[in-house]
């Protein structure tokens, strides 16, 4: 895609963000007709760049995040991309950065999560509406599904060579922490109606991965601890109190 085409794509995105934020009723969808009229392009030009407004919402998030991840401060990180099974359109855009610690299996993901929240805070009113009203896309579910496979890879790294989990336990831990993280993000935007206080959260940006590591360590302390953990997990799945 040429420079002029990229500029058109970004102009469409900027105009869409402006219209979403200015919409008096956030439950009402900004359609393609309104968008192309505002930016003074034809519908064909829009569809040359995006499939629909759902695709546009996804690209806005992914393109800005990828731009941040390609910054020099991430040169030591391992960039990762959407899992193949998601059939994501933007497989060329990195969506994750993995920072390895000094110890084997240690991950320090704080810089990445702070960067993600910075991307959201840049357009806080836009993302408040995108998270809060599913008239374009269930954005919360999109980012959850994007991150669950990435967390599964993280867990595999943290397990190392000598420890193994059942497939269901591995999946459970990845889902639990990925959905928990994004649920908290949505809480700020949709219910607390505020941006994420990134500076105040400096001590806990790596909290999800710290919790995963502590959970894994507790599970593998010994046969008794491992059996207890799996029994509690089974009870939780069955809906019985722990």
Regions found by a protein language model. Name each.
Residues 6-32, 62:
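Short, amphipathic alpha-helix enriched in basic
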Residues 11-18, 38, 55-78, 111, ...:
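Alpha-helical structural segments
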Residues 18-22, 61-108, 127-131:
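Amphipathic alpha-helical linker/stalk segments
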Residues 23, 79, 124-131, 158-161, ...:
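Secondary-structure edge/capping motif, primarily at the C-terminal ends of alpha-helices
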Residues 23-59:
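Helix-turn-helix
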Residues 112-122, 134-161, 171-183:
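Amphipathic alpha-helical packing segments from all-alpha helical-bundle domains
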Residues 156, 178-242:
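C-terminal peripheral helix-coil segments that are non-catalytic and often amphipathic
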């Amino acid at each position: 895609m040429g420079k002029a085409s990229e500029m058109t794509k970004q102009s469409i995105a900027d105009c869409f963000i402006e219209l979403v934020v200015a919409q008096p009723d956030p439950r009402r969808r900004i359609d393609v007709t309104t968008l192309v009229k505002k930016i003074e392009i034809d519908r064909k030009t829009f569809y040359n760049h995006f499939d629909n407004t759902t695709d546009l919402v996804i690209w806005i998030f992914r393109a800005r995040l990828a731009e941040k991840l390609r910054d020099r401060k991430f040169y030591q990180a391992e960039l990762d991309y959407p899992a193949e099974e998601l059939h994501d359109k933007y497989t060329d855009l990195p969506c994750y950065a993995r920072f390895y610690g000094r110890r084997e299996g240690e991950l320090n993901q704080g810089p990445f999560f702070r960067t993600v929240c910075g991307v959201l805070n840049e357009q806080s009113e836009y993302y408040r509406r995108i998270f809060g009203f599913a008239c374009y896309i269930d954005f919360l579910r999109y980012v959850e599904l994007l991150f669950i496979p990435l967390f599964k890879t993280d867990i595999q790294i943290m397990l190392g060579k000598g420890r193994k989990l059942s497939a269901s336990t591995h999946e459970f831990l990845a889902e639990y922490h990925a959905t928990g993280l994004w649920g908290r993000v949505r809480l700020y935007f949709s219910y607390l109606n505020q941006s994420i206080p990134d500076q105040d959260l400096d001590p806990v940006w790596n909290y999800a991965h710290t919790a995963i590591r502590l959970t894994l360590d507790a599970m593998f302390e010994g046969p008794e601890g491992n059996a207890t953990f799996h029994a509690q997990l089974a009870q939780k799945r069955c809906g019985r109190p722990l």
